[in-house]
Amino acid sequence: MSSTVTSVFTFKVESTFDEWAAIFDSKEATRRHREFNIQPLYRGCSDDDPQKIIVIHQHPEGNIEKFVEANGDWMASHRVDLSTMEKAAWTWTDNSNVQFKAA
């Protein structure tokens, strides 16, 4: 049985969304995400504040924390204001291998 987490992050950037997205969509960012088995699902910016970003990822439990710990300096160097980062996590468990018995 394995747990998959869907993480929703919001944070501010000190650049434009397009500048930040170019880095997020880069081969280097893809390599770093894959290293921690993180699948980006969505990224966008707020209509009210174009410097407020939302990112949604899916990953094994605990991997996003390892990613941020290993890559925090790299993220900050791309003008991400880590002090504004907020996270919500949504978990589901894959029970596809569980055998159910009739009562």
Language model segments and positions:
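Short, well-ordered beta-strand segments in beta-rich or mixed alpha/beta enzyme
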Residues: 5-12, 41-72
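Short amphipathic alpha-helical segments
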Residues: 15-41, 73-76
